[in-house]
Curated annotation (Swiss-Prot):
Forms part of the ribosomal stalk which helps the ribosome interact with GTP-bound translation factors. Is thus essential for accurate translation. It comes from the Bacteria. GO terms for molecular function: mRNA binding; structural constituent of ribosome. It comes from Rhodospirillum rubrum (strain ATCC 11170 / ATH 1.1.1 / DSM 467 / LMG 4362 / NCIMB 8255 / S1). The lineage of its organism: Bacteria, Pseudomonadati, Pseudomonadota, Alphaproteobacteria, Rhodospirillales. This is Large ribosomal subunit protein bL12. Belongs to the bacterial ribosomal protein bL12 family. HAMAP family: Ribosomal_bL12 (MF_00368).
Length: 123
């Protein structure tokens, strides 16, 4: 243990140029490189976690707006609900109109409901 402490003291006393020379000598003697593997870390970060694109969406009726009757008609057409069920859904907003639908179908439903006067969001 005393030898290690003595070695640490001697290494601490080296100048920067002497430390660089020591590094080169050790690299040659042991056949290694003191360069940091930066490229490997960058590649690992890129392959870490691919972002998955969402494939299923929920269409949420946030607010029916001023034209409730038009929104109720659209909800009935989209969901095949009866008049009372569609009315309850619209008046109980925010509620899901359709769940787990494709991106295209969700966008189509959102467009129809917004044209009828509703506020809609996709989740």
């Amino acid at each position: 243990m005393a030898d290690l402490a003595k070695l640490v003291d001697e290494l601490s006393a080296l100048t920067v140029l002497e430390a660089a020379e020591l590094s080169k000598l050790l690299e040659e003697k042991w056949g290694v490189s003191a360069a940091a593997p930066v490229a490997v870390a960058a590649v690992a970060a890129e392959a870490a976690a691919p972002v998955e694109e969402k494939t299923e969406f929920d269409v949420i009726l946030v607010d029916a707006g001023d034209k409730k009757i038009n929104v109720i008609k659209e909800v009935r057409a989209i969901t095949n609900l009866g008049l009372k069920e569609a009315k309850d859904l619209v008046e109980g907003a925010p509620k899901p109109v359709k769940e787990a639908v494709s991106k295209d179908e969700a966008a189509s439903i959102k467009k129809k409901l917004e044209e009828a006067g509703a506020k809609v969001e996709l989740k």
